[in-house]
Every structure is written in C-alpha cells, then in structure tokens.
C-alpha cells in the first residue's frame, strides 16, 4: 500500500488535532487557563489545521467534496467519545473535554459542540464546493 499525500495528511491531521486538544485540556486543568480561550484554540485548530496540513503535504483533499463531507461527518461523530461514561473510562478523553467544557454551557456542552460543528461544516462544505466549481483554490495566504 502506497502512502499517498492524502493518507499522510489525514494521519497528520488526526495527530495534530489530538495534540492540540490534549494541550488545551492540560492548559485548562493544570495552568488554570480560562476554558473560553482553550475552546477558541480548539475551534481554530479544527477548522484551520486541516487546510494548513494539506498544503504541507501537497494533498488534494480539499478539492474532493466527498472526502470533505466524510471528514466533516467523522469529525462531528467523534464527539461521541466525549460522553461522560466514555470520558470516565478513558482519562485522555476527559482531559481533552476539559479544554472546551465551559462552566456556562454545562450540562449542555456536547449539544453546543454538535450544533457548532454542524453549522460550521454546513457553511464550509458548500463554499469549498462552490470555490472548486469556480476554479478558485482554498489557501491560507
């Protein structure tokens, strides 16, 4: 099996997002950084790291609408890992959760996240598709 740039990029995205989420959880838990800030870091990472990583690997994942739709679905469904019984059984998930669990959102933190992810991807996917139809590249620069 050949490790294409798309596969390498997908693995790098998973590792990068996991690292960011563990780091923001540690900032909130051990260094008392306000969750409002760590949550923003997580949101930025979730929506912008994939674009940056694709550019580093010269991957074409952002031109493939099906790949994008599946990635958005998997990312949104991955929030299931943050349900309380799972978090209690797997401590790293609890640490990651603490990076975006604002006190004012409790006990509805996951509901808020589901809606934010769904709304974000509902806007992003059609825009990316439209830009692709127009021949415009998605770029950070």
Show where each model-derived region lies.
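Interhelical loop and helix-boundary elements at the membrane-water interface
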Residues: 2-16, 23-67, 76-141
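Selective transmembrane alpha-helices of multi-pass membrane proteins
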Residues: 70-72
């Amino acid at each position: 099996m050949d490790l294409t740039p798309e596969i390498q990029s997908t693995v790098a995205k998973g590792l990068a997002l996991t690292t960011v989420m563990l780091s923001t959880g540690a900032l909130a838990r051990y260094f008392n950084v306000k969750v409002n800030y760590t949550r923003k870091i997580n949101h930025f990472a979730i929506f912008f790291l994939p674009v940056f990583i694709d550019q580093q690997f010269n991957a074409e994942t952002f031109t493939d609408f099906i790949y994008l739709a599946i990635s958005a679905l998997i990312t949104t469904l991955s929030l299931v890992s943050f349900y309380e019984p799972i978090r209690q059984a797997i401590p790293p998930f609890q640490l990651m959760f603490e990076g975006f669990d604002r006190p004012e959102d409790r006990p509805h933190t996951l509901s808020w996240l589901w809606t934010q992810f769904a709304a974000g991807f509902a806007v992003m996917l059609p825009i990316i598709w439209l830009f692709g139809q127009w021949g415009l590249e998605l770029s950070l620069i």
